[in-house]
């Protein structure tokens, strides 16, 4: 399984990348806006840090606008993946871009039908949202399981990016269900390394070693 960082904070990306567990980065207009910096500059800086797919999202709403923007974004770096919203216009754009060899990440997927349509259109990645589905009482884990089953059954080349990850339990569950990738907010990476028994165990080891060395 691959781990992507769901942030555009360059300092956080640098720090977490040193752990050796980051395979890529995802961003969206909200995440970019939080940084208050030029979109292109931020994406290029991220590409210089992480050697893996870096998702940058279009903001156009028509297929023509998305394609035009995507072509420009794709030129920023070889690792850039263009994020496209799951709409009819987004599907049109994804189809065009896939034929041009531009990698796409179709986002805001909440149903099996949406995921299937995105894969048929040629998406490189599909991003079903875990937390947001749970917010409305829908079984997000079943969606991941169903999408993975369809990919394996029909040999689609698209990979599942489990998005809207909020807890370590989310990461663990989607890993077991076969999501190819989990995109994780930077604060959650630290939580994934921690457990009280680990902390207490290390404390005991150090205390015992200090007593032994006296």
Curated annotation (Swiss-Prot):
Catalytic activity: D-sedoheptulose 7-phosphate + D-glyceraldehyde 3-phosphate = D-erythrose 4-phosphate + beta-D-fructose 6-phosphate
Pathway membership: Carbohydrate degradation; pentose phosphate pathway; D-glyceraldehyde 3-phosphate and beta-D-fructose 6-phosphate from D-ribose 5-phosphate and D-xylulose 5-phosphate (non-oxidative stage): step 2/3
EC class of the enzyme, as a word: transferase
Keyword Cytoplasm: yes
InterPro entries: Aldolase_TIM, TAL/FSA, Transaldolase_3B, Transaldolase_3B/F6P_aldolase, Transaldolase_AS, TSA/FSA_arc/bac
EC number: 2.2.1.2
One function term, GO molecular function aspect: aldehyde-lyase activity
GO cellular component: cytoplasm
Domain of life: Bacteria
Main location, first listed in the record: cytoplasm
Active-site residues (renumbered): 83 (schiff-base intermediate with substrate)
Xref: PROSITE patterns: TRANSALDOLASE_1, TRANSALDOLASE_2
GO biological process: carbohydrate metabolic process; pentose-phosphate shunt
Subcellular location(s) of the protein: Cytoplasm
Pfam families from the UniProt entry: TAL_FSA
Record key words, sorted: Cytoplasm, Pentose shunt, Schiff base, Transferase
SUPFAM superfamilies the record matches: Aldolase
Entry keyword annotation includes Zinc: no
Biological function: Transaldolase is important for the balance of metabolites in the pentose-phosphate pathway.
Database matches in NCBIfam families: fsa_talC_mipB
Family: Belongs to the transaldolase family. Type 3B subfamily.
UniProt xrefs under PANTHER family: TRANSALDOLASE (PTHR10683:SF36)
Protein name (Swiss-Prot/TrEMBL): Probable transaldolase
């Amino acid at each position: 399984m691959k781990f992507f960082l769901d942030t555009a904070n360059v300092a956080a990306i640098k720090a977490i990348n040193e752990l050796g567990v980051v395979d890529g980065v995802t961003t969206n207009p909200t995440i970019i806006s939080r940084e208050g910096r030029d979109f292109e500059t931020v994406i290029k800086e991220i590409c210089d840090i992480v050697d893996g797919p870096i998702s940058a999202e279009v903001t156009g709403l028509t297929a023509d606008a998305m394609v035009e923007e995507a072509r420009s974004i794709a030129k920023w770096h070889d690792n850039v993946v263009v994020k496209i919203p799951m709409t009819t216009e987004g599907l049109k754009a994804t189809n065009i871009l896939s034929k041009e060899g531009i990698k796409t990440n179709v986002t805001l997927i909440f149903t099996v039908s949406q995921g299937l349509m995105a894969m048929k259109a040629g998406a490189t990645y599909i991003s079903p949202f875990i937390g947001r589905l749970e917010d409305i009482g829908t079984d997000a884990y079943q969606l991941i399981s169903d999408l993975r089953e369809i990919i394996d059954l029909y040999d689609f080349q698209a990979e599942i990016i489990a998005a809207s990850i909020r807890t370590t339990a989310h990461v663990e569950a989607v890993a077991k269900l076969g999501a190819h990738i989990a995109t994780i907010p930077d604060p959650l990476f630290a939580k994934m390394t921690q457990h009280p028994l680990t902390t207490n165990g290390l404390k005991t080891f150090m205390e015992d070693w200090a007593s032994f060395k006296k």
